[in-house]
Amino acid sequence: MDIPNLILLAGGKSTRMGSPKGLLDYRGTLWVLEQIARYKFIENSIAYIGLGYDYEQYLNAIPWFKDAIENSYNYNGVEVRVVINNQPQFGSFSTLQTVLKKVDIDSTVIVLPIDVPLLNKQSLTSIINENNKVVIPTCDAKNGHPVKLNSEFWNTLLPIDMFSKNARLDTQIKQLNSLSITFVNIIDNSVYQNINTKEKWNYYCKTQ
């Protein structure tokens, strides 16, 4: 099984949340660390954390993130690498591009926004086991995350001008032949959750 690198996108402003989403408290730990820890069940796992706005708050809250910028850091069995997007104003796609430039060109990746909970091992494995240019989980007839991208596809994202209207992952996926996309049905509505407000966060913490 080709083990993909996890890319956690945490470079946004978190305006509606009011504070960096990855630094929210989740049962005594920080949310970004919880997300990383959920990937430990995948053997030989590597996680890239894409930071942008508020990156200094992340580095202050998690001191070893500073070390993980230059060298990978083992956290709960996951090799973590931190990448800072110095131009986060261009959106999450620019953060994704910044991270992808650090990833081995032959590696498969799975992309997850910080405000979408990572799936459990069984659901995640069902995504990882599928082989195509793009693999997308679905639940209740809604597409979601994490999205798996093979190296052939994601390498085509690197040259895209961040000023372009096409500088969006969903736009690039829509341009693919339908045979290049596999949809995997997941019995977990986490795939389409977007926990971007305090109300949604409080509800998630109470129900999970």
Task: Please report, for each region that a protein language model flagged, where it lies by residue.
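Conserved alpha/beta core of the MobA/IspD/sugar-nucleotide pyrophosphorylase nucleotidyltransferase superfamily
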Residues: 2, 163-208
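Nucleotide and nucleotide-moiety/phosphate-recognizing core
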Residues: 2-143, 177-188
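Short, flexible helix/strand-to-coil boundary loops that buttress conserved ligand/catalytic motifs
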Residues: 21, 62, 123, 158-161, ...
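Short aromatic/basic micro-patch
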Residues: 118, 148, 194-195
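Short, well-ordered alpha-helical scaffold segment located
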Residues: 118, 123, 153-156, 200
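A conserved catalytic-core signature of glycosyltransferases
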Residues: 142-144, 148-149, 168, 190
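Conserved nucleotide-sugar donor-binding
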Residues: 144-157, 198
